[in-house]
Amino acid sequence: MTYNTDKSKALFARAVRVMVEGGSSPSRGPANYGEYPLFIDHAQGSRLYDADGHEYIDWMMAYGALPLGHAHPKIAEAITNASHTGTLLAAATEIEIEVAELIQRMVP
């Protein structure tokens, strides 16, 4: 099956004008994807949807970091709630201790 990916191709042409090899990461460049990568518009559960509207199964799931899939409602809600206390804190926080304690309980 061959899909028309003209929008991804156009987005890549735009990207190469402002980013080295058209991406912010070496893994997104043509060395890994051939002529141009697919540009993903959105994701839900185990599915990715490209800029041209095609649906794909996300076999990689962020290299294993998404066991519940993309845009899981409970995860999205937790992220929204957590964002009200700060979006990126490089300082020490209580939640950091709580996560470490949880990991310690789960992995003796």
Give residue ranges: language-model regions.
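Active-site and channel-lining beta-strand-loop segments
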Residues: L38-D58
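Short active-site-proximal "capping" loops at secondary-structure junctions
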Residues: N32, G45, G64-L66
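N-terminal alpha-helical segment of soluble enzymes
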Residues: M1-T2, A82
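Glycine-rich loop-to-alpha-helix module at the N-terminal edge of alpha/beta enzyme cores
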Residues: E55-P108
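Active-site-adjacent loop/helix segments that line or gate small-molecule/cofactor pockets in enzymes
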Residues: T2-H42, L102
